[in-house]
A protein has these predicted regions:
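Charged, amphipathic alpha-helical oligomerization/scaffolding segments
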Residues: 30-37, 56-59, 63-66, 85, ...
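Hydrophobic, Leu/Ile/Phe/Ala-enriched alpha-helical segments that form helix-helix packing faces
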Residues: 38, 42-45, 64, 71, ...
Length: 113
């Protein structure tokens, strides 16, 4: 599915992490794919309220939880900078799809990082 939201389609997700050699590109690519799948799901299912959005972001957050082992295997981790950038990406997505009242912490409440 192609992302139709222009703001999202043009956004460089996780760019500051790609610019830091500490974070392996191949794992970041998987994280970026998680974010894009979330966007595709939002466009396909069109959540009607914050509760529905939070259910969607919970699944995407759990996918990031699973990536932690891959970061560690590559000598990296989801540390403070990465946590902030990933959280910001979730918040950006919520805003881009019209959820101005989304709580940044609630968007990633299922995080283990």
């Amino acid at each position: 599915m192609t992302i139709t939201n222009r703001q999202v389609a043009e956004h460089a997700f996780l760019l500051p992490l790609y610019e830091d050699d500490y974070f392996p590109d191949h794992v970041l690519d998987r994280g970026r794919a998680v974010l894009l799948r979330l966007c595709e799901r939002i466009e396909a299912e069109r959540p009607g309220d914050l509760a529905a959005l939070y259910r969607m972001t919970e699944g995407a957050t759990e996918e990031f939880n699973a990536l932690e082992a891959e970061f560690e295997a590559a000598g990296s981790e989801i540390e403070t900078v990465a946590r902030e950038e990933i959280g910001e990406a979730f918040w950006f997505i919520a805003q881009a799809y019209g959820f101005a009242d989304a709580d940044g912490e609630q968007l990633i409440a299922a995080r283990e990082w």
